[in-house]
Amino acid sequence: MQDAREIVRGAKLYFCSQTEIQERYEVTMNQIYLEMNHIKKTFGKLEVLKDISLSVHKGEVVSVIGPSGSGKSTLLRCATMLEKMDGGELSFLGEKAAWEENGKCVYANKKQLKEIRKNFGLVFQNFNLFPHYTVMKNIIDAPVCVDGVSKEEAKERAWKLLKQLGLSDKADAYPYQLSGGQQQRVSIARALALQPKVLFFDEPTSARDPEWTGEVLRVIRQLADEHMTMVIVTHEMQFAKELSDRVIFMEKGLVCQEGTPEEVFGNPNARVKEFIGRVMQV
């Protein structure tokens, strides 16, 4: 383990002390939150995920990198049960959500799945905010309508999140009145309002606007400091290198390399080295 690791805060780089890194490792080496074993997924004749296995520990930040079309987003959608798997096992805190039976993937009953789904949050690449809802309405809608939280409690949660994410003056704004970075922060607030144990990000900085990319990366860094368990699909190689506890490289539906940032970026196999070199030159 290195003595210090650079981290992202806004558009600047800072250093994370050895003590801070050790604290992160102490948190992550205990409880397994999410476990996926031998996951398979096909769309028609196209095999998108081929025998993928992944475990995520409490407080861990896992970055998933790789070329477009490698199955990264599909992996996230299977983990959050937005897509049904065709094979393999999915469990959270040891409770099985899906498993193989007689060569087919079987899911738990609706009541069990509803409870398990409460543990996951997904921040979409394109925000997916309701355009006809205000920022406040976007954030409180799911807690009230899905989880049965009172409107008062949902608003209290929302105000705390808006303040935390620097959006307290945008509660009554509509998505079209916000910048890309602000919309993505609202999307993060909406996911956090459900109080998930694991937060998934699908290309959170895909728009390549340096100003709002810095805004979003700063929020993710803040969540990491608070030991939020996160799985992040990203093309931001420097970000993945600096912030992650573990990095996974995927290509053609397979995990080609997995390890700490030091292992993946410091000693990549030939294919990973080629990919990293090409992406970091862009």
Predicted regions and their residues:
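The feature captures the beta-strand-to-loop junction immediately N-terminal to the Walker
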Residues: 65-67
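A short, proline-enriched helix->beta-strand linker immediately N-terminal to the Walker B motif
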Residues: 193-197
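Catalytic Walker B motif of ABC-type/P-loop ATPase nucleotide-binding domains
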Residues: 199-202
